């Protein structure tokens, strides 16, 4: 079975333009992501999907494979679907281009559900929430699932709502596991044939309310399998986030 990791990479960004090419210890960020994705045991090949020639040139310079995509795509899923239509992969992994510290093991963890169960169209990851700040923050997407790992809902709101313990919420309750809740890790794995189906679905009510594209899948009755991971990464949305990445690398 052929498994391809695709890294959608845009140059334009409201908070950090050109972040895909941001220098991290002598290499562009997109190269760090590419090299880490290539180390995943289950991944057969890695492709960067971009509509920007500057990013494409940088990828070619370090010997990576790049696919040019339409500049009119509204979402990363649309860009991914375009690439998936051009390749012969059975499974396509969407690796975020702004995750230079992603652990290759995370990618393997997210892929396995699709290898174990051919009826699953899509999978993703979650990790434990360990601070009250993350639990309350609308920038941290929470997720709940059933006992077999099927996602029930994603939300920017606190999820679940601990009605009887709301006034006693403290960091130590999350660290100890007394209050068990999870945040979504934005790594997605798809069966190739499901990507055009997903891309062809119209935006849904809950998706538009929460501004979470993955809710479109649930609202249309498709399953998303979710796996808990112990690994955490740092998404680079701002120059300040890049500083955190550099500090983490210096500590290693």
Curated annotation (Swiss-Prot):
Entry EC no(s): 2.7.7.38
Taxonomic superkingdom: Bacteria
Cellular location(s): Cytoplasm
Keywords carried by this UniProt record: Cytoplasm, Lipopolysaccharide biosynthesis, Nucleotidyltransferase, Transferase
Segments forming a coiled coil: none
Reaction(s) this enzyme catalyzes, per UniProt: 3-deoxy-alpha-D-manno-oct-2-ulosonate + CTP = CMP-3-deoxy-beta-D-manno-octulosonate + diphosphate
Annotated GO MF terms: 3-deoxy-manno-octulosonate cytidylyltransferase activity
Enzyme class: transferase
Pathway: Nucleotide-sugar biosynthesis; CMP-3-deoxy-D-manno-octulosonate biosynthesis; CMP-3-deoxy-D-manno-octulosonate from 3-deoxy-D-manno-octulosonate and CTP: step 1/1; Bacterial outer membrane biogenesis; lipopolysaccharide biosynthesis
Predominant location category: cytoplasm
One of the GO biological process terms: CMP-keto-3-deoxy-D-manno-octulosonic acid biosynthetic process
One Gene Ontology CC term in the entry: cytosol
HAMAP family in the record: KdsB (MF_00057)
Role noted for this protein: Activates KDO (a required 8-carbon sugar) for incorporation into bacterial lipopolysaccharide in Gram-negative bacteria.
Family, per entry: Belongs to the KdsB family.
NCBIfam families assigned to the protein according to its UniProt record, in alphabetical order: kdsB (TIGR00466), PRK05450.1-3 (NF003950), PRK05450.1-5 (NF003952), PRK13368.1 (NF009905)
Identification of the protein by name: 3-deoxy-manno-octulosonate cytidylyltransferase
Species annotation: Geobacter sp. (strain M21)
């Amino acid at each position: 079975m052929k498994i391809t990791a695709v890294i959608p990479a845009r140059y334009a960004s409201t908070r950090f333009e050109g972040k895909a090419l941001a220098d991290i210890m002598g290499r562009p960020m997109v190269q760090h992501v590419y090299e880490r994705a290539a180390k995943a045991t289950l991944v057969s090949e890695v492709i960067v999907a971009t509509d920007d020639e500057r990013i494409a040139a940088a990828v070619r310079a370090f010997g990576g494979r790049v696919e040019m995509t339409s500049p009119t795509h509204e979402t990363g899923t649309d860009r991914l679907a375009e690439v998936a239509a051009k390749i012969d992969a059975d499974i396509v992994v969407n690796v975020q281009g702004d995750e230079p510290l992603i652990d290759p093991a995370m990618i393997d963890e997210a892929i396995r559900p699709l290898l174990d169960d051919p009826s699953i169209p899509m999978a993703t990851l979650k990790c434990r929430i360990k601070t009250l700040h993350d639990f309350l923050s609308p920038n941290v997407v929470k997720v709940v699932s059933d006992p077999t790992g099927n996602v029930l809902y994603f939300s920017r709101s606190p999820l679940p709502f601990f009605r009887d313990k709301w006034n006693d919420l403290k960091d130590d309750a999350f660290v100890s596991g007394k209050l068990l809740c999870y945040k979504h890790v934005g790594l997605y794995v798809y069966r190739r044939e499901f990507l055009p189906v997903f891309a062809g679905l119209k935006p849904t009510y809950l998706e538009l309310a929460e501004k979470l594209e993955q809710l479109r899948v649930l609202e249309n009755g498709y399953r998303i399998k979710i796996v808990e991971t112990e690994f955490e990464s740092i998404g680079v949305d701002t120059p300040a986030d890049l500083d955190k990445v550099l500090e983490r690398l210096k500590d290693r």
